[in-house]
């Protein structure tokens, strides 16, 4: 908790993903944070954090946004795409799943977080950021075991293809 307090106090822009895995299930909870500019979770992580299996993802994401006083909360939903809540825009932005071929989904949430944090931190709109981050995740699911990074030129080409 001491490290979290230091990060909260010193970070110019703070993006947080409290990833759930076999080594930390339930112990690295978003509720340990009192602020974040961006919280990025997948749907199971969201449901675990709120202890709620039944309410809508949007309702639970807003609950987390308020708990952590976050500017943005993004929820990746696998085959259901992604959503992002924006406090300042008072909107929910949605992106459909942008990949047609999934080889390995490990790392897709990390790719989403990386591009979402970078985009929002640079001042892009949450709508545009959700799309770009979803495109990065779509590329990532086509890479086995994060073998290769997502090259900027590959992301540009993929986005161009999606927009045609």
Regions found by a protein language model. Give the residues of each.
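Conserved phosphate/ATP/ADP-binding segment of small-molecule kinases
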Residues: 2-92
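Glycine/charged-rich beta-loop-alpha catalytic/anionic-binding loops adjacent to active sites
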Residues: 89-101
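Conserved post-catalytic alpha-helical subdomain immediately downstream of the catalytic base
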Residues: 71, 98-162
